[in-house]
Regions:
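Glycine- and aromatic-enriched mobile tails/lids
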Residues: 6, 12-26, 30-185
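Short loop/turn motifs at secondary-structure junctions and domain boundaries
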Residues: 1-5
Length: 186
């Protein structure tokens, strides 16, 4: 992390990022930490990344493991069968495309679109451009991605391709959400 710049408050949290309300956690810009309460843009972002990646998986999991006494989820339902069928079809489709572009190459293109058009300095025009470019990139992905390996092997490329398919949806949603938000919150 960069050095502390200054703080402007934020929600008080304990070492595990839990507020004074049991089970309610505050991370990133929201909490009262060195980089919380929306300090320098990159610093606040890094606080959220660090909290989400290093701290929360352990603290929330530990908290919930003592609180949740849920019965085992049934898998013999129509909804489960439908979800499983859709995932299997998606996997089969990805493995059958046989395109020329690697998952990483398409992922880099998405990152470039997001960086140039959906970052902190964005305009209506840049957001509209991002939406158009992401839609085109999604078509390109489903037409020309190359996913090597097999379905039932430990297949990192398949895992990355499945995530990238989700990232393409998420990127467009982020751009659309930003486009629809006309007021400033910070």
């Amino acid at each position: 992390f960069p050095a502390v710049h200054y703080t402007m408050g934020g929600i008080w949290v304990d070492y595990n990022l839990m507020t004074t309300i049991p089970g309610l956690y505050a991370i990133g810009e929201a909490n009262f930490s060195d980089h919380g309460a929306n300090r320098l843009g990159a610093s606040a972002l890094m606080q959220g990344l660090a909290d989400g990646y290093f701290v929360l998986p352990y603290t929330i999991g530990d908290y919930l493991s003592h609180k949740i006494q849920a019965p085992k989820v049934k898998t013999d339902t129509k909804a489960f069968d439908q979800a499983e069928k859709e995932v299997k079809e998606k996997i089969a489709k990805l493995l059958s495309i046989g395109g020329k572009q690697s998952v990483d190459d398409i992922h880099k293109k998405l990152g470039h679109i997001m960086w140039e058009n959906v970052g902190m300095a964005r305009t209506k025009e840049s957001l509209e451009k991002a939406i158009t470019e992401i839609q085109a990139l999604r078509k390109e992905f489903w037409k020309d991605v190359k996913v090597v390996g097999k379905e039932n092997d430990f297949n990192v490329e398949l895992e990355k391709a499945l995530r990238l398919a989700d990232f393409l949806e998420l990127g467009e949603l982020m751009a659309r959400d930003a486009l629809n938000r006309e007021e400033s919150c910070g």
